[in-house]
């Protein structure tokens, strides 16, 4: 029995990797991560005999976040002294190689995903009807369509090269296909810094939003170009890419207000701006955060931009709807559905006036 098997298994699980047993043959192993559909977790483990005779597991592991492999070294819990100087040097070299192997594997995976996405995009229909878009009250800007009626959003870089796709389905279509309503395809795509631009080349102002429906709403309401970042975690990287591509253009991040969350401990609903740390139901740290606001703030800081949130007329009712029924009203598409495009336009223009941003 490997002396630190249970300890290493615990370290990987604590990092979020879903693993039942450990492969210690020194090869790259991919695995799923808690609360995530994709296999973004990885590890490379080896066996090494210590001076005292015990065989220990050594190596590294991590969770992919964009282009960052998140590499961490297996902690040996004060047993490093049991290795010779030569063993420690060999281990250091092996860990460095593991990180390079992880990076190389990720680049190859992303390249395969980009090729598959580009091929699928070329075969998709130029025109179509989308139940998803109809349910959101928005048009399809630069989209293509699947034979089953799904809307397809390209995920591209500043040169227009496609790196992945987002497939949008109505709830009915998702249930029939046994797939999610929003699906990133294919597995392994590189999202970081990639986006979908609506409305042509920005001249002086560019809006940035998370989801397609939100971005489409903003474009329909204002006529301004809008970029889709797809997730809150991608906002900063997309903002950097856009600022580099369109120098001198102001970037306004139109954030999702993810104030309604669930406690990680008891799964009860709460409002994170009213309970900053502990859950009001179980008293434990809820470990929840307003990802939309945090992501938008980070993006604005990166590019000297600004942020804004949708302002609902009856915000108390919006909050109560989440706490009592789990109904989330978070973005400008929700505002569009409840109060109309004219309200969205008025709020954006008011924010631009407040910032003293105007066309030259």
Task: Give the positions of each predicted feature.
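TOPRIM fold recognition
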Residues: 1-6, 204, 220-360
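Short, basic/aromatic recognition patches
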Residues: 131-148
């Amino acid at each position: 029995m490997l002396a630190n098997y249970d300890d290493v298994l615990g370290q990987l699980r604590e990092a979020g990797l879903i693993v039942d047993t450990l492969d210690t043959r020194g090869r790259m192993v991919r695995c799923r991560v808690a609360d995530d559909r994709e296999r973004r977790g990885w590890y490379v483990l080896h066996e090494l005999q210590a001076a005292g005779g015990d065989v220990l597991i050594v190596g590294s592991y991590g969770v992919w976040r964009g282009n960052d492999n998140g590499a961490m070294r297996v902690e040996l819990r004060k047993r490093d002294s049991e290795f010779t100087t030569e063993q420690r040097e060999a281990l250091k070299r092996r860990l460095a190689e593991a990180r390079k192997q992880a990076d190389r594997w990720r680049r190859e995976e992303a390249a395969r995903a980009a090729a598959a996405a580009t091929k699928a995009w070329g075969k998709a229909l130029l025109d179509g009807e989308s139940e998803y878009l109809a349910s959101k009250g928005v048009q399809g800007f630069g989209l293509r369509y699947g034979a089953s009626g799904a809307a397809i959003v390209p995920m591209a870089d500043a040169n227009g090269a496609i790196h992945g796709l987002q497939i949008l389905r109505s709830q009915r279509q998702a249930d029939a296909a046994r797939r999610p309503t929003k699906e990133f395809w294919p597995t392994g795509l590189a999202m970081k810094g990639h986006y979908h631009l609506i409305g042509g080349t920005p001249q002086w102002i560019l809006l940035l939003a998370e989801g397609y429906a939100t971005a489409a709403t903003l474009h329909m309401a204002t006529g301004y170009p809008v970029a889709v970042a797809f997730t809150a975690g991608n906002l900063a990287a997309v903002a950097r890419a856009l600022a580099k591509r369109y120098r001198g253009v102001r970037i306004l991040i139109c954030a999702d207000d993810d104030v309604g969350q669930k406690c990680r401990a008891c799964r009860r609903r709460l409002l994170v701006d009213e309970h900053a740390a502990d859950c009001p139901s179980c008293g434990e740290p809820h470990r929840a955060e307003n990802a939309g606001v945090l992501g938008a703030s980070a993006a604005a800081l990166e590019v000297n931009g600004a942020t804004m949130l949708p302002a609902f007329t009856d915000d108390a009712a919006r909050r109560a709807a989440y706490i009592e029924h789990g109904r989330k009203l978070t973005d400008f598409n929700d505002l569009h559905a409840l109060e109309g495009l004219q309200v969205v336009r008025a709020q954006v223009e008011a924010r631009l006036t407040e910032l003293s941003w105007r066309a030259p």
